[in-house]
Amino acid sequence: MGERTGTAFLRGWLGKDFVSKITRRRAMTAEQRLLVGTDQVEAINRLRPVAILAHLLGALIALDALARSSSASIAPAWFVVMLAVIIFDILSGPPLAGHRPARGEVAALYWRNIATCFLFGAVWGSLALIFYAGAEDDVRHVLTVLLTAYLASSAFILAALPRAVFAFSMPMAIMMIVSFTRAGVADHAFELQLIGVYALAFPIALRQHASAFAERVVAMAQVGEQTQLISLLLHDFEANSSDWHW
């Protein structure tokens, strides 16, 4: 009785489509969840070379900008940490040429990707936390553009795995907010507003994308099963037809 009342309330308040998505998601079988997780990990693995190259190029840009600042002496240490995380990602992950995980690999690779994204987000966030307050205006401009680009693009590159987006963006956004606040809220109102818009808009978009991604994976699996069943039925029909002709 309570569940029916709650469902009716949700249908009236949020709409039938929203509730039906929750119901379908909750009714997903363990096999379907494994299939969705497999496709999520595979999608992330395909983009890992692009992400690794982007991290390396961005770190080089940051190092070049910091070489002209008062923090030039400690900038190489930050760059070494970024290189260490990149090497860790390469060595601990699957082949960079694209890899569809086996059933037994899905859970480990799923959480490995999330942990690696958190490390990258923390390193990028530390760039602002360590260097922004004492940097010159031109260096601040480079750091702001660079960090904003990585924060925004993470929602697209990692969209197949929403938890990875949050693992990457949360530490980065928090450290950017702290850095901008320390440098003066009034002078960085625009940047703080952009982060606020990101925090409000992208989770909604990610949720919709994740629902559509899961529905598409399950639908394609069902189509494959039905196609296989039809092929078997046609094969049996052809075999029986040949017996009748004989």
What role is predicted for each listed range?
Residues G2-R33:
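Short, charged cytosolic
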Residues G6-G15, V41-H55:
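Hydrophobic transmembrane alpha-helical segments in integral membrane proteins
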Residues R26, A30-E31, I44-R100, G196-V197, ...:
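Hydrophobic alpha-helical transmembrane segments of multi-pass membrane proteins
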Residues L96-P101, A135-V139, P162, A210-A221:
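Membrane-interfacial segments
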Residues P101-C117:
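Juxtamembrane helix-capping/reentrant segments at transmembrane boundaries
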Residues I114-I204:
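Hydrophobic transmembrane alpha-helices
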Residues G196-L229:
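Juxtamembrane or sensor-core-proximal signal-transducing alpha helices
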Residues Q228-W246:
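PAS/LOV and related PAS-like sensory modules
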